[in-house]
């Protein structure tokens, strides 16, 4: 806060009238604006995913925001943040593949399975490169994985990490996860090894480090972690926080637009077919009404599609039995991605 130039001032009075607080809250909500699109933040180490969403929401002064998959505070890299109507497409990103580059430190197991935890076991043994390479096929494909004790999984309504912090012994059941690719990238010294993993939804890289250490006859934990891919979003889509803040400053002075940082809402829908409709059919779908597919030129696709009209996203829909049934309708009034952002590097 800046200094006060007034030499004398009445004591600040706090208005505890709930109606006044409600009016103030309503004013804040009125001041927020409609912003629709994706921002792929290159999250810095030390920031939680929830904090990152709050920062983006403030920078864009957006009404709604949410992220597509938690990234641990100790990790850096891609955190896709949905603004406005893009929040309706979050599940499509969360179901996509993830790619991580991570460093395992050998010789210690920790209660969190990462460098922030308490050491629970130690070993003097260090795995050889040959032993590590021989192990990798065992962690490729569909495997059974026990999530870390410190995870967001619920046990009888309680988060596992809350129970663990309270000193309770948390027993988590193994669950199937899919690891599409696991490679050894580097071995800087005997104490560390750098890996890259491409995996499906629900995979814990921390558990991967723990289990590899145990099978190699030693212990291991994550000491560095970076996410480089989330669904359709790769490193070329990421924007560091300082660059985003600088863009916001330029936009505030009229030298740029925040739209330049947005990716279109439909970027999250890369893996499903698009279906173009006429303006008349678009009006029906927008009202929540089904549209019949008719004529020789009617599309033959079925299942989930995203519907466009005049090149603009309209709805998520299901196609079947000769009709289009709208499931989620998009209202893209407000700030959206710049036209050129549809073409990505």
From Swiss-Prot:
The active site is at residue 72. It is an enzyme of class 5 (isomerase). It comes from the Bacteria. It holds the Pfam family TruB_C_2. SUPFAM superfamilies: Pseudouridine synthase. GO terms for molecular function: pseudouridine synthase activity; RNA binding; tRNA pseudouridine(55) synthase activity. Keywords: Isomerase, tRNA processing. Residues 9-20 have a biased composition (Basic and acidic residues). Its EC number is 5.4.99.25. Residues 1-33 are annotated as: Disordered. It catalyses: uridine(55) in tRNA = pseudouridine(55) in tRNA. GO terms for biological process: mRNA pseudouridine synthesis; tRNA modification; tRNA pseudouridine synthesis. Belongs to the pseudouridine synthase TruB family. Type 1 subfamily. Responsible for synthesis of pseudouridine from uracil-55 in the psi GC loop of transfer RNAs. This is tRNA pseudouridine synthase B.
């Amino acid at each position: 806060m800046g200094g006060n130039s007034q030499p004398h001032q009445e004591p600040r009075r706090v208005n505890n009238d709930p109606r006044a607080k409600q009016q103030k809250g309503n004013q804040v909500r009125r001041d927020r604006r409609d912003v629709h699109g994706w921002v792929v933040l290159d999250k810095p180490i030390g920031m939680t995913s929830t904090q990152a969403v709050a920062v983006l929401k403030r920078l864009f002064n957006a009404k709604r925001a949410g992220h597509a998959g938690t990234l641990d505070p100790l990790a850096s890299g891609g955190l896709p943040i949905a603004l406005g109507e893009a929040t309706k497409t979050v599940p499509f990103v969360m179901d996509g593949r993830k790619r991580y580059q991570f460093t395992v430190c050998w010789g210690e197991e920790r209660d969190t399975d990462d460098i922030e935890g308490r050491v629970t076991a130690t070993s003097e043994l260090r795995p050889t490169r040959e032993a590590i390479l021989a192990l990798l096929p065992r962690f490729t494909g569909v495997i059974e994985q026990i999530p870390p004790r410190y995870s967001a999984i619920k046990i009888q309504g309680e988060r596992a990490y809350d129970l663990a912090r309270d000193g309770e012994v948390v027993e988590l059941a193994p669950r199937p996860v899919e690891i599409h690719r696991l490679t050894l990238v580097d071995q800087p010294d005997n104490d560390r090894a750098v890996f890259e993993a491409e995996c499906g939804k629900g995979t814990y890289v921390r558990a991967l480090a723990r289990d590899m250490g145990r099978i190699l006859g030693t212990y291991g934990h994550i000491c560095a972690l970076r996410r480089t891919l989330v669904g359709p979003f790769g490193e070329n889509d990421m924007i560091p926080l300082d660059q985003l803040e600088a863009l916001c400053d330029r936009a505030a002075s009229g030298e740029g637009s925040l739209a330049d940082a947005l990716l279109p809402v439909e970027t999250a829908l890369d893996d499903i077919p698009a279906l173009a409709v006429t303006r008349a059919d678009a009006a029906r779908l927008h009202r929540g009404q089904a549209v019949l597919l008719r004529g020789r030129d009617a599309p033959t696709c079925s299942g989930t599609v995203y519907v466009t009209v005049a090149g603009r996203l309209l709805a998520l829909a299901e196609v079947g039995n000769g009709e289009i049934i709208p499931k989620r309708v998009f209202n893209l009034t407000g700030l959206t991605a710049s036209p050129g952002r549809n073409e990505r590097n």
